[in-house]
Amino acid sequence: MSRRAKLILATLTFLFYCHMALAQNKYDAFTVKVSGKGQPVILIPGATCSGAEWDETIAHWNGKYQTHAITIAGYAGTAPMAGGPYLDKVRTQIEQYIADNKLKDVILVGHSIGGFLALSIGMDMNSSLSRIVVVDAMPFFAGANNPNAADTFSETQAKGMLDRYIKMDDQQLKASQMMITKFMCLDSSRWDMIATWGQQSDKRTMAYTMCEMLGKDIRKDIARIKVPVLVLAAYSAMPQYPQFTRESVAKTFGDQYKACTECTVHVADGKTRHFIMYDNPLWFYKEMDTFLQKNN
């Protein structure tokens, strides 16, 4: 090989790796695992959770879709973002990811904070989307039980939450996450995995993403969504809260989503808490598959 050819090859190799490095650095708000072929589905997990939350869902589809399983930066042991506003960065970078990869007729599936993000993306990108599935999330969670909840991010609240996390060692944080997990998921075989994701998450990211979601009211803004949206709401009777009924859940979610003419709310028929895909997978898959097949 001539000296000139070697120089050209070396230059092209250098440019290739520069391009790869830039592509990887472009999306510092999340990591993504892509598998399968077909219509693209972007899956966004709940707070502190890994994209592996969707492993069984992806396996259920058995290659029918091209799945893009997101893990938000800072969750479940991944490197955190340099700073906030965290959820705005995640939203804008997922939108950029859709545009950069020329994804069309995208199905968005989001759980918890991921559902809030899916709604936010749906407000911006109707032309690129086909359907949205929201798993136990609301456009203004803080306002569900508090009509006076403020539509503003509270730095004081976020710092207070972060301070509580910082004071915990790993064992204490794991115990705290386990307590929360046991309340949010009935499937005991999942408890350690979910609590470990929380323990491994960046404490600042945990505090600020949660407070950013709690401090943002998009109940009116979801009227801008022009693609069909299926909202799946969890319900499991709790004797200590007799006023908490399936009917009360349906009313709360209905009130939250009343501005969205494209939104349909379905409430689980019992023994299903926040991690619907784990507690009631048969109902979850049936509801989602029926909804997505209407797209064909």
What are these regions (language model features)?
Residues L103-N146:
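Conserved hydrolase catalytic core segment
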Residues A268, T272-P281, Y285:
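Catalytic histidine-centered segment of alpha/beta-hydrolase-like enzymes
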Residues A69-V109, I113:
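Active-site loop/oxyanion-hole signature of alpha/beta-hydrolase fold enzymes
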Residues I132-M168:
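Flexible "cap/lid" loop of the alpha/beta hydrolase fold
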Residues A149, Y165-D221:
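Conserved alpha/beta-hydrolase catalytic His-Asp/Glu region
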Residues V34-P80:
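Conserved HGGG/HGGXW glycine-rich cap/lid loop of the alpha/beta-hydrolase fold
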Residues V229-T272:
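Conserved loop-alpha-helix segment in the C-terminal half of the alpha/beta-hydrolase fold
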Residues M1-Y27, V229, N295:
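Bacterial Sec-dependent N-terminal signal peptides
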